[in-house]
Amino acid sequence: MTIRLKGGYDIFMVTIRPVTEVTKSLTDAYRVLIPQLSSSSNPPTEEALQRIIESDSAQILIAEDENGGILGTMTLIIFQIPTGIRAWIEDVVVDSSARGRGIGKKLNLAALELAKQAGAKTVDLTSRPARKEANQLYKDIGFIQRETNVYRFSFE
């Protein structure tokens, strides 16, 4: 239920939780969310989602409304390298109908807490410059833009 207060603010419950099983609502959500994130990527298959869930290094986090509807998702990867434990955030997307409500912030803060609990020294992410709101959110949370280059090698 949404309660409207004076000033036009909506109050609603959002739960952030790790995904523990592939469900129809999860696959349906990815069919809607992935095109909002990338026009060049296809939604993951049930098998791909299952491999992520079973992975020791990756976790899918979702933001659910009070009715269990999935409003957003992200992937957190935590990994050990010779210089310590690191974490990486990928594929952060909040449904366009739910943006501006702090859901992206809640997802990121949950991921940061999980990374901290796992002993990560740092958490990195990338964001296209055109995603102005997302970039501002990351700065507001405390991410610092690094002076580095990101390179990609593609097998496709």
Range-by-range predicted roles:
Residues 2-24:
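Conserved N-terminal entry element of GNAT/NAT acetyltransferase domains
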Residues 9, 41-60:
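Active-site rim helix/loop that mediates acceptor-substrate recognition in acyltransferases
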Residues 31-43:
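Helix-loop element at the rim of GNAT/NAT acetyltransferase active sites that forms part
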Residues 62, 69-78, 88, 93:
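Conserved beta-strand in the GNAT
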Residues 79-89, 99, 146:
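A conserved beta-turn-beta hairpin within the catalytic core of GNAT-like acetyltransferases
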Residues 94, 100-113, 140:
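Conserved acetyl-CoA-binding loop-helix of GNAT-fold acetyltransferases
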Residues 105, 117, 129-147, 152-153:
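Conserved active-site alpha-helix within GNAT-family acetyltransferase domains
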Residues 115-127:
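Conserved GNAT acetyl-CoA-binding A-motif
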